A protein has these predicted regions:
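N-terminal Rossmann-like NAD(P)+-binding domain of SDR-like oxidoreductases, especially those catalyzing
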Residues: 1-189, 349
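Short-chain dehydrogenase/reductase
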Residues: 99, 190-191, 255-258
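NAD(P)-dependent short-chain dehydrogenase/reductase
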Residues: 142-147, 151, 157-160, 165-246, ...
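Residues within well-ordered alpha-helices
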Residues: 28, 206, 302-303
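Residue-level recognition of oxygen-bearing side chains
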Residues: 15, 74, 105, 112, ...
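C-terminal substrate-binding subdomain of Rossmann-fold SDR/epimerase-dehydratase oxidoreductases
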Residues: 34-37, 67, 211-352
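Glycine-rich phosphate-binding loop at the start of an alpha helix
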Residues: 93, 97-100, 204, 300, ...
Length: 352
C-alpha cells in the first residue's frame, strides 16, 4: 500500500465516516487523521466503557458528531453543514448475538440507517465517492468449503447478517435508481481482529479479558471457521476503493469481498491457541458450548475479484494479526502511550 499516495489524495479532503467511535471506525479515523483529511465522524457514543476511541483521544483530533444513523433529519443537517466529498458508511449494530435479542433495533440501524445515508448522498451536491462497509455474512451460508463470490445469493441467516444483506440491496437500488454517475461500492469484509476491540462476544476481546483476569476463556464454537484478518487489512482497502473509484469509476467501483487467503481461514480453537502462544503465561482456555443461538459454522470468502481489480494481496497472516493484537493489548495493560503504539503499528504495517 502506497501511504504517500493516500496522503496526497486525502490531505485536506472532507471525509464523512459513520461509525467512527467503534473498533474499526477508530482505527480508520486514526489513519485518515494521519493522512491530513478534514474528518467528520457521525456515530453514537463508543459502544463499551473501555474503548479505543477514548484511549486514543480521537475526539480532539476530528469533528466528532454524536448522532444516531436512524435520525435522517439530523444526518441531513450534518451533510448540509460539512458538505462531505467522500463518505464511508460503517455505522451498524455489529454483534450477531445482540441481533437475536434486539432484532428490530438491528434492522432499524443496519437497514434504515443505510437508507438514510444513501438518501443524504442522493441529495448531496458535494459527494464524489461512496463506500458501504457490510460483512462476509451477507451470503446465504451453505456451510460449503469454498469461498463465496460476489455473485452468490445474499440471504444472511440471523438478524444481523440478514440486515447487512438488506443493506447491500438498498445500496444497489440507490445506485441503479439515483446514483448512476456517482462512484458507489460495497466492501464485504471478514472477521477483523486487532488491538482496541473491547466488544462482548468477540473471541479476541474475550481472550484479553480472560488473560488480564487470570481466568480461562470459554470457547463456544471451537470448530467454527472464519476469515480472520487484522483490522488494518480491510481499512486500507476501503481507502483505496474510495480513492480509485473517484479517479476511474468504471474500472474500480463494484461489490468486493475483503478477506484473507484460504490458509488463514482458521477455526476458533486454532486462533485461541495462537493467542495463547503470543500472550504467554497467565492465559488458558476451556471448550464449552453454551447452547446459544445459531451462528454459521463454516465461512470463507473468495477475494479474487479484489485481487484482480485492485492488484491487492494480504500483508499479514493470521498469526501476524494475533501478534500485533497481543502487542497492542499488552501495551495498553501496562499504561503505555497508545496513540504512539497505534501509529507505530500502522506505519510498520505499511512498511511490510
Amino acid at each position: 500500500m502506497n501511504f504517500e499516495e493516500l496522503k496526497k489524495f486525502y490531505n485536506g479532503k472532507r471525509v464523512l465516516l459513520t461509525g467512527h467511535t467503534g473498533f474499526k471506525g477508530s482505527w480508520l479515523s486514526k489513519i485518515l487523521i494521519m493522512c491530513g483529511a478534514k474528518l467528520t465522524g457521525y456515530a453514537l457514543n463508543p459502544p463499551t466503557d473501555t474503548n479505543i476511541f477514548d484511549i486514543l483521544g480521537l475526539e480532539t483530533e476530528m469533528n466528532s458528531v454524536t448522532g444516531d444513523i436512524r435520525d435522517l433529519d439530523h444526518l441531513k443537517k450534518v451533510f448540509d453543514k460539512v458538505k462531505p466529498e467522500y463518505v464511508i458508511h460503517m455505522a451498524a449494530q455489529p454483534i450477531v448475538r445482540d441481533s437475536y435479542e434486539r432484532p428490530v433495533y438491528t434492522y432499524e440501524t443496519n437497514v434504515m440507517g443505510t437508507v438514510n445515508i444513501m438518501e443524504c448522498v442522493r441529495l448531496s451536491n458535494s459527494v464524489k465517492s461512496f463506500l458501504n462497509v457490510t460483512t462476509d455474512k451477507v451470503y446465504e451460508n451453505k456451510e460449503q468449503d469454498k469461498g463465496y463470490v460476489e455473485t452468490d445469493f445474499l440471504d444472511g441467516y440471523d438478524p444481523y447478517s440478514n440486515s447487512k444483506s438488506c443493506s447491500e440491496l438498498v445500496t444497489h437500488s440507490y445506485k441503479k435508481s439515483f446514483l448512476a454517475d456517482l462512484p458507489v461500492s460495497t466492501a464485504r469484509a471478514g472477521n477483523v481482529i486487532g488491538g482496541g476491540d473491547f466488544a462482548k462476544d468477540r473471541i479476541i476481546p474475550d481472550c484479553v479479558r480472560a488473560a488480564v483476569s487470570g481466568k480461562p476463556v470459554i470457547i463456544r464454537n471451537p470448530n467454527s471457521i472464519r476469515p480472520f484478518q487484522h483490522v488494518l487489512e480491510p481499512l486500507f482497502i476501503y481507502l483505496d476503493i474510495v480513492m480509485r473509484q473517484a479517479q476511474d469509476r468504471e474500472r474500480f467501483e463494484g461489490y468486493f469481498n475483503v478477506g484473507p487467503d484460504d490458509s488463514d481461514c482458521v477455526n476458533a480453537k486454532t486462533l485461541v491457541e495462537s493467542f495463547k502462544r503470543a500472550w504467554g503465561e497467565g492465559f488458558d482456555f476451556n471448550i464449552h458450548s453454551d447452547g446459544g443461538p445459531h451462528e454459521a459454522g463454516f465461512l470463507k470468502l473468495n477475494c479474487d475479484k479484489l485481487k484482480k481489480v485492485y492488484g491487492w494481496k494480504p500483508v499479514l497472516n493470521v498469526h501476524d494479526a494475533i501478534d500485533l493484537s497481543v502487542e497492542w493489548y499488552k501495551a495498553w495493560s501496562k499504561g503505555e502511550d497508545m496513540d504512539a503504539v497505534t501509529k507505530k503499528q500502522i506505519l510498520e504495517y505499511l512498511n511490510r
